[in-house]
Amino acid sequence: MDKISVNKLVEEVKSNLPREIIVSIAQSCLNENTDSQTTIKNFENELYKYTLNVQKKVINCTGTLLHTNLGRAQTDINFTGGSTNIEYDILNNRRGKRNEFLNQSMNLLLGSEDVCFVNNNASSLYITLKTLKNIYGKKSVIISRGEIIEIGGSYRLPEIIQETDLKMVEIGTTNKTKITDYEKALKENEDSLILKVHRSNFSINGFVEEVNLKDLKSLTESHNSILIHDLGSGLVASRKFLEKENIDIFDDEPTVQESLRQGADLVMFSGDKLFGSLQSGIIAGDKEMIQSIKESPLFRTYRCSPLTLFELQETTNKYVSKNEIEIPLWKMIAMNYEELENRIKSITENLKIKHEVVHDNSVMGGGTLPNKFIASPVIQISELENTNLMSKLIHNEIPIIPRINKNNIIIDLSLIHI
């Protein structure tokens, strides 16, 4: 059988992959004991797959702002590496408190007594419940059946609660939960807490009823209980800013600040959704409870990296200084239809491929605002008439990721941060 060597395969390849990986791919293909032509073809295909799988910057033209598979919120990362005073008191030249400035500025933004940061919002919920069980002696979690959620990636709320060793007490029905349901559960389950979950990735309409945070707070106070609000999506942008920028799709979306004002002892939310920063979980509220979470043995296993904390600090500062529009997510959302049309025109003026500019809608994605859309003009190109276009887009120096709809390549420019 005509064979080819590893060196021969590797020498003829132009790739940015480390040589050791290329050699490994070549050896794997040679071990299949095929003829030279087949080996070369298999090697090229495997190398192609590896190259596409390398984590890299891409251009999101899908029309989904918080695309979970593309990293959710786009950010301006200004941290260039090196050492950082993440836990250092520069003034006194000694060890200091971890991310002290971020804590202060986030409390100022949210109106919270204290705050802490973990690596994602699932961790926020888990470490909160575990701490309230271990430190505060809670034995069960009371939750409405209409709020027992599942989100992308097979995250199911009951499974998280089960891992905390707390008993989950389901109350009400899918569409209706009343204050009397909570009251009955509190009486029947000693040392319980109430968990209210924001249905950020689906909605229930019609014959529905739920209990607001103010009424739940009054109830927990009279029963020596605790009220937790898992907001998930985590809107913190001010109503004044949204009104100024004519953004009305968030009119029915609760903000973190509103949840705290209405009485939630602890509120948790994601940093990479409507907050517009990097993947993280943010827990805000009662100082004593937050301190207990920070002192938990679990906290070190879930805490954020210096890069994440730096970016959270940068994003928080923009909110505090009323410069929300500088946050890439809000800059994209606030862009008006005419601006997008002009952006498309500047690109399509010299575009030789047959195309159409059509009306479409962008969506938030990331498990947020399931029934809301943002009007957006898009470039539509027939995939059937341009069979090589998709390959050219994904093989661009910075891969361009469009979406496919009914054999059309759709390029939405509203998500390109300039």
Model-assigned labels for residue ranges:
Residues 26-27, 31, 61-62, 71-93:
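Glycine-rich phosphate-binding segment of PLP-dependent enzymes
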Residues 93-316, 348:
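Conserved PLP-enzyme active-site core in the AAT-like
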Residues 36-75, 104:
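Long amphipathic N-terminal alpha/beta scaffold segment
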Residues 143-144, 306-309, 313-365:
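Conserved PLP-dependent catalytic core of the aminotransferase class-I/II
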Residues 1-48:
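Long amphipathic alpha-helical segments
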Residues 416-418:
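Conserved small/polar residues in nucleotide/adenosyl-binding loops
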Residues 4, 59-63, 122, 274-278, ...:
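Short Gly/Ser/Thr- and Asp/Glu-enriched loop/turn motifs at secondary-structure junctions
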Residues 341-413:
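Conserved C-terminal alpha-helix-loop-beta "cap" of PLP-dependent enzymes
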